């Protein structure tokens, strides 16, 4: 259940969606489906500068099964999927005012020893996504690469 402050957060995130060239034409129902679970599970980071929201990121902690569904259909996440596993997926990354590097820095601090993945959608190819990998600020490149490879192999097997 959302609390009073959660509605303020929701409004700030909605404002960022409205200012994002990629998100602004997405439906309100998609905003609710992607944002409310993040707020309810405290799985988001909202950067604010001088009282104004400047960037937002949300993540889900998926199981291998929900991850396989998500890769096939990014609209497949259910509320129970958001905090069901240990496989971190970035759901939204919104920085419409050029603060993506700052958001990345904060996320690396938030998850210093973790790795995560995201489906990167390019504005010119809206129907095509690419899985990208992110690593925490204190995890070694060697450990991250080993974990990425393991997760990739497990996902390939799950998708078959």
Swiss-Prot record:
Top-level enzyme category: transferase
Active site: 23, 92
Principal place of residence: cytoplasm
Spans traversing the lipid bilayer: none
Catalytic reactions of this protein: a fatty acyl-[ACP] + L-lysyl-[protein] = N(6)-(fatty acyl)-L-lysyl-[protein] + holo-[ACP] + H(+)
GO process annotations (BP): killing of cells of another organism; toxin metabolic process
Tree of life domain: Bacteria
EC number from the UniProt entry: 2.3.1.-
One GO MF term: acyltransferase activity
Family matches, as InterPro entries: RTX_toxin-activating_protC_bac
A GO cellular component annotation in the UniProt record: cytoplasm
SS bonds (residue pairs): none
Keywords, alphabetical: Acyltransferase, Cytolysis, Cytoplasm, Hemolysis, Transferase
Subcellular location: Cytoplasm
Assembly description: Homodimer.
Family: Belongs to the RTX toxin acyltransferase family.
Functional note: Protein-lysine acyltransferase that catalyzes fatty acylation of the protoxin, thereby converting it to the active toxin.
Protein name: RTX-II toxin-activating lysine-acyltransferase ApxIIC
Species whose genome carries this gene: Actinobacillus pleuropneumoniae (Haemophilus pleuropneumoniae)
């Amino acid at each position: 259940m959302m609390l009073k402050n959660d509605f303020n957060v929701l409004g700030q995130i909605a404002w960022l969606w409205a200012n994002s060239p990629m998100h602004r034409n997405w439906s309100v129902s998609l905003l609710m489906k992607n944002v409310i679970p993040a707020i309810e599970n405290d799985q988001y980071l909202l950067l604010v500068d001088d009282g104004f929201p400047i960037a937002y990121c949300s993540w889900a902690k998926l199981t291998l099964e929900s991850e396989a569904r998500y890769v096939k259909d990014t609209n497949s996440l259910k509320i129970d999927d958001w905090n069901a596993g240990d496989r971190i997926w970035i759901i939204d990354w919104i920085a419409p005012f050029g603060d993506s590097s700052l958001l990345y820095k904060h996320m690396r601090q938030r998850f210093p020893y973790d790795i995560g993945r995201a489906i990167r959608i390019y504005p010119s190819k809206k129907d095509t996504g690419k899985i990208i990998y992110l690593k925490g600020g204190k995890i070694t490149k060697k450990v991250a690469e080993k974990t990425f490879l393991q997760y990739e192999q497990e996902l390939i097997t799950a998708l078959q």
